[in-house]
């Protein structure tokens, strides 16, 4: 039986997202109380409260280096944060509906936001420029991720499809069709040559990536 080390208390509403950093000494949590918090796993203490969103926080993620993290919100924005200082570095306001998921690539050079407006937006982390808006889904995008090589982005949508996009060009390279209802989750395997998608109708499908 596992032993509990800490109870992290501080949020005032549901916690819907959480992630460890790479070394495992920090956790970021996102809550419907509009805040994200960064916690020290060695002490259980809240290191920073990340404030600024005007709506529920839907998603969070650290970059691989652990010096940056992302938060996505129902307020239609995503924010890039300095983890050490707990300071907001930039606010991305390109979506016209709720931001439902965010993700860094493995290098931290790019990040992506996915929205209920049916698009995903790819950003250059260093410059803050939106390099591509991924357009093609006919419903909201609930999940987004990069492949391990950082050459492709995968999106999962309520339109019953997943799509794989080239990160260099923003072009859709593969559309995965077969689910009979909304797709809520998607992931690449470690090599990036296989994909799994999960749907509202209690099924998962495994696919071979063509990128």
Language model feature labels by segment:
Residues 1, 12, 23, 29-33, ...:
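Conserved strand-to-loop turn within each blade of WD40 beta-propeller repeats
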Residues 1, 41-43, 83-86, 125-128, ...:
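Short loop/turn segments that connect beta-strands within beta-propeller blades
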Residues 3-6, 45-48, 89-90, 129-132, ...:
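A structural motif specific to WD40 beta-propellers
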Residues 9-15, 51-57, 93-99, 135-141, ...:
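WD40/WD-repeat beta-propeller blade N-cap
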Residues 18, 30, 36-40, 60, ...:
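WD40-repeat beta-propellers
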Residues 19-24, 61-67, 103-109, 145-150, ...:
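Loop/turn segments within WD40 beta-propeller blades
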Residues 26, 30, 37, 41-98, ...:
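Solenoidal tandem-repeat scaffolds enriched in leucines and small polar residues
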Residues 184-211:
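Blade-level signature of beta-propeller repeat domains, shared across WD40, Kelch, NHL, RCC1
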């Amino acid at each position: 039986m596992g032993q509990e080390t800490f109870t992290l208390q501080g949020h005032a509403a549901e916690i819907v997202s959480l992630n460890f950093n790479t070394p495992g000494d920090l956790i970021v949590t996102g809550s419907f109380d509009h805040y994200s918090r960064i916690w020290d796993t060695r002490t259980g203490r809240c290191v920073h409260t990340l404030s600024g969103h005007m709506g529920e926080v839907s998603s969070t993620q650290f970059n691989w280096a652990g010096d940056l993290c992302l938060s996505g919100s129902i307020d239609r924005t995503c924010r890039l944060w300095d983890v050490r200082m707990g300071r907001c570095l930039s606010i991305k306001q390109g979506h016209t509906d709720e931001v439902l998921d965010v993700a860094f690539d493995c290098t931290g050079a790019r990040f992506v936001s996915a929205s209920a407006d049916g698009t995903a937006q790819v950003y250059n982390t260093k410059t803050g420029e939106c390099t591509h808006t991924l357009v093609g889904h006919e419903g909201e995008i609930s999940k987004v991720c990069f492949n391990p090589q950082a050459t492709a982005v995968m999106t999962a949508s309520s339109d019953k499809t997943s799509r794989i996009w080239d990160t260099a060009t923003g072009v859709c390279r593969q559309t995965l069709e077969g689910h009979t209802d909304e797709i809520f989750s998607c992931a690449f395997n470690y090599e990036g040559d296989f994909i799994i998608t999960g749907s509202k109708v209690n099924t998962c499908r495994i696919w071979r990536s063509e990128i």
